[in-house]
């Protein structure tokens, strides 16, 4: 049985597409192994219930900016990364996978750098390549993309099938939300979003006049107001299918996976992209893509207009779905890449006179 190593983590956008692929890979007879970061990471927590083999490597995220904290963090990267690459090489020798599928982000970088002769497939959800995938391309990885405008093989973004499994009535019963209420779902991303969280709280009295607000505020150092009948704060939700099902409007950061999920579900959505100062600008690109699919966009410097923009979104058409058989396309690429790797290996053995 061929083993596939999936790697990626740190945020939901680098984990959920991998989770979406796992059932398809298992149905095709592959054994799946996940490699993520050390400690209580989102990738460890989300893969744990699946019962798949999990291995961890030491990783450090690049922090943008020139603050003392950022400088101290970034100075540790060469030391931690070197140790991680050494560990990754040992791990690959132990696992002997047929292929590595890297979802980008700093968690995937050690395996990208250590992959050696193991076939490498990298997937980029954003319109522009992140640093890890840029390195993956230089290291000979096969590049898959979510958009035809991005250089590579366009396959789309893998989406979890369970997202399509819930209906509004049943989901509202399960969450004790009245059937006639309008529901606003706020998603700041798995790491939270301080500016978005603060804007929601600032306008909460206005928003709760029109909506029951379900607020996914993230886990990082944020204390939301107390729960009421019209305000439901949650640090995180494993059952996103139910939350999507109950919502009439979604307020979200413009992560590529969030854009893909909300368009596939034909939701009414307002996106607040991360500004370029705290990111490489990928969410600004994603927001423009979302707008072309019927989503609305509000930039951080206009968050004072949040209630009005949410109301406009409520009375706008839903997003248009462009969802296709992404999983099938990726599984086909994986099979082809394994086959190419085996042919290359056999050719070299033949040239060297080996059986």
Language model regions located:
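Active-site-proximal region of nucleotide-activated glycan assembly enzymes
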Residues: 3, 31, 39, 53, ...
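Conserved nucleotide-sugar phosphate-binding/catalytic loop shared by glycosyltransferases and other
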Residues: 3-11, 26-80, 300-303
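A short, glycine/small-residue-rich beta-strand->loop->alpha-helix junction that serves as a flexible
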Residues: 6-19, 194
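Donor-nucleotide binding loops and adjacent catalytic segments primarily
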Residues: 40-46, 50, 65, 168-173, ...
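Structural loop-to-beta junction motif characteristic of Rossmann-like glycosyltransferase folds
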Residues: 52, 118-119, 248-249, 266-274, ...
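Glycosyltransferases and closely related glycan-assembly transferases
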Residues: 86-101, 108-121, 134-138
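Acidic donor-binding loop of glycosyltransferase active sites
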Residues: 97-99, 245-260, 267-268
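C-terminal alpha-helical cap of glycosyltransferases
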Residues: 308-312, 323-355
């Amino acid at each position: 049985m061929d083993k596939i190593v999936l790697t990626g983590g740190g945020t939901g956008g680098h984990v959920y597409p991998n989770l979406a692929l796992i059932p398809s890979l298992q149905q095709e007879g592959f054994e799946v192994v996940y490699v993520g970061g050390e400690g209580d990471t989102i990738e460890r927590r989300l893969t744990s219930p699946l019962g798949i083999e999990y291995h961890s490597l030491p990783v450090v995220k690049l922090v943008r900016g020139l603050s003392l904290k950022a400088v101290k963090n970034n100075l540790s990267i060469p030391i931690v990364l070197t140790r991680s690459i050494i560990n990754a090489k040992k791990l690959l020798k132990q696992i002997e996978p047929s292929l590595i599928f890297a979802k980008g982000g700093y968690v995937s970088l050690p395996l990208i750098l250590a992959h050696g002769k193991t076939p490498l497939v990298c997937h980029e959800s954003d319109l522009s390549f992140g640093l890890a995938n840029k390195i993956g391309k230089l290291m000979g990885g096969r590049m898959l993309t979510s958009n035809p405008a991005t250089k590579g093989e366009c396959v789309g973004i893998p989406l979890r099938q369970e997202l399509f499994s819930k209906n509004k009535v049943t989901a509202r019963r399960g969450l004790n939300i009245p059937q006639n209420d309008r529901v606003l779902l706020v998603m700041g991303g798995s790491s939270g979003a301080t500016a978005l969280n603060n804007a929601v709280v600032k306008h909460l009295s206005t928003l709760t006049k029109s909506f029951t607000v379900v607020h996914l505020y993230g886990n990082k150092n944020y204390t939301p107001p107390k729960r009421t009948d019209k305000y439901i704060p949650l640090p995180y939700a494993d059952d996103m299918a139910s939350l999507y099902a109950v919502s009439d409007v979604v307020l979200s950061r413009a992560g590529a996976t969030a854009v893909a999920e909300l368009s596939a579900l034909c939701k009414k959505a307002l996106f607040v992209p991360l500004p370029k100062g705290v990111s490489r600008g990928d969410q600004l690109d994603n927001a423009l893509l979302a707008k072309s699919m019927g989503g609305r966009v509000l930039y951080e410097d206009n968050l004072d207009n949040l209630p009005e923009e949410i109301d406009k979104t409520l009375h706008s058409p839903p997003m248009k779905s462009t969802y296709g058989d992404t999983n099938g396309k990726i599984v086909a690429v994986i099979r082809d890449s394994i086959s190419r790797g085996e042919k290359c290996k056999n050719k070299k053995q033949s040239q060297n006179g080996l059986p």
